[in-house]
Every structure is written in structure tokens, then in C-alpha cells.
Amino acid sequence: MQNAFTIDQLPLSWQEQLENEWSQPYMYKLREFLQSEYSQKTIYPAKDNIFTALKSTPFDSVRVVILGQDPYPGEGQAHGLSFSVPQGVRLPPSLVNIFSELHADVGVKNTTGCLQSWADQGILLLNTVLTVRAGSPFSHAGQGWEQFTDAIITKLIENRSHVIFVLWGNAARKTCDLLFRSTHKHAILAAAHPSPLAAHRGFFGCSHFSKINYLLKKLNKPMINWKLP
């Protein structure tokens, strides 16, 4: 586990931003917790995929942040990108709803659930908690991940401009309270969570995908190609 949980796993741009965070006491406690969990229980994602979001989207490349909660707890689902599943894996209900809204909004129809190409285009697909015990949602909440991902968001707020933060659900909004003091530098799109329990309360019809590209176009930045390969 030690090799999977070192800062040199990250792109240099993230290492520079998070170097001080890595040595904080809560990170040592989190490392010890994860070492115990991975050695005794089934934990998702695989160790090498814990930081896939940061590996896929370097700090200087982030244009959009889509915040999730914690990884999917089912076997073979989580691979380190929020809301995403590996190629060939059945789409979870939240992702089905995301794709339904995407199709209604911009006419793009996706059938594969791997969102890697979105990450490659500058969308940081970040969960607020990066690991989970198999079959037990939120089982790794309150162990330090929230503090770490808050630090990631804070670095983006302070050291980047014109990032589009997409907040789906109350948990994402709470995580990004800092954003509401930084709206002059960043854009915020908020809606209900895409889960079946909440999607009809404001996720469907939010048009976030077209709004993201509208904002990027205004900034003279390349728009996102939402079609997955």
C-alpha cells in the first residue's frame, strides 16, 4: 500500500500544489487507515486507481470540476473517476440519468460508461471521498479524504481562474462552500444529484452540459466533446 499512497503517484503539477498537504497529520492517519482496510477487507477502487482523477487531469489542465461523493461500492465499478465505470461495465443508475440529461440537452447519446475522455479534456472527475468498502457506501467518510479533497478544491480556487465547478446534490454544495466567496474568478453550476432518488427534483432539465460549453466558448477555450469513444 505504501507505494500506492505516495505523492510521486501524482503529476508534477499536483505534487507542487499538494506537497504541504501530504505531510499533514491527518494524512498520516488516513494512510494508516487505508493500509489496514486494504489488507483486511475488499476496498474500491484498486490501490493503483485511487488517484486516477488527478493523474488524468493535471492541475494546469483543469477547466471543469464535476464533484461526486464516494466511489461506487459494487465489484468492478469504481476506477477512480467520479460517476465513471470501466469499459464494458453496466451503467449505474446515476450515470444512466446523467446520460439521459446529456442526450436531452445536447443530443449526444453514450452507451459506454467510461468517462476517461472527459477527464482527458480537462474535466476533473473528483469524488470527495476517494475509497470505499465493498458493498458499503460512505464507509470511508470521515477518515480524512474530505479534508484532502477540500484542499484540492481550495488550490484550484486560489491558484486558477475561470474554472467551472459543477455541483450535483447537497453533499457537493457543502464541499464547495468556499466557492461562493470566489465567484469573480470561477463559475458555479448547481443542481440536484443525478441519483434516481433526486434526479427529478432538479437534475433533469438543468442543461449543464450545454451551459459548460457556452461558458468555455465565452472564455475562448475549446468546448467539451461529450461523445465517448
Curated annotation (Swiss-Prot):
Gene Ontology MF terms in the entry: uracil DNA N-glycosylase activity
Assigned GO CC terms: cytoplasm
Main location: cytoplasm
EC number from the UniProt entry: 3.2.2.27
Record-linked SMART domains: UDG, UreE_C
Cell compartments where the protein resides: Cytoplasm
GO BP term, example: base-excision repair, AP site formation via deaminated base removal
PROSITE patterns given in the database record: U_DNA_GLYCOSYLASE
Catalytic residues identified in the record: D70
Stretch forming the signal peptide: none
SUPFAM superfamilies: Uracil-DNA glycosylase-like
The protein's enzyme class: hydrolase
Substrates-to-products reaction catalysed: Hydrolyzes single-stranded DNA or mismatched double-stranded DNA and polynucleotides, releasing free uracil
Pfam families cross-referenced by the UniProt entry: UDG
Matching InterPro entries: UDG_fam1, Ura-DNA_Glyclase_AS, Uracil-DNA_glycosylase-like, Uracil-DNA_glycosylase-like_sf
Gene3D superfamilies the UniProt entry points to: Uracil-DNA glycosylase-like domain
Alphabetized UniProt keyword annotations: Cytoplasm, DNA damage, DNA repair, Hydrolase
Family: Belongs to the uracil-DNA glycosylase (UDG) superfamily. UNG family.
Function: Excises uracil residues from the DNA which can arise as a result of misincorporation of dUMP residues by DNA polymerase or due to deamination of cytosine.
Stored PANTHER family: URACIL-DNA GLYCOSYLASE (PTHR11264:SF0)
NCBIfam families xrefs: PRK05254.1-1, PRK05254.1-2, PRK05254.1-4, PRK05254.1-5, ung
Protein name: Uracil-DNA glycosylase
Protein's organism: Chlamydia abortus (strain DSM 27085 / S26/3)
Lineage start: Bacteria, Pseudomonadati, Chlamydiota, Chlamydiia, Chlamydiales
Gene: ung
